[in-house]
């Protein structure tokens, strides 16, 4: 991995997305991307009494779907980078706690997705160098 200029990183091994999973709410399900979602909810609260509980359930089910689709056993997941907009990553924290892996909470509001991809990519690149070289 090389730093090019002040903000650009060139990876020795480009990051690769092996699998995806997504659960969408009713508004997203009504849009043109509905066919790409793994599951579409009729109720954005998914039967829960609070947004925190609903989003924790969505995080947990989405991660379980991702693990299932990837074929990678959950005990092989070594780290998780995630974030949400509720109460200091509470939905991600509770949704991921049964996975029992180190969790890196990201506080980036709208940038959470891209920030998570960047941090995880750098982490994986460095981790692979430490472990396999």
Show which residues each predicted segment covers.
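Conserved "HGTGT" condensation-loop signature of ketosynthase/thiolase-family condensing enzymes
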Residues: 1-104
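Active-site-proximal alpha-helical scaffold in enzymes
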Residues: 106-132
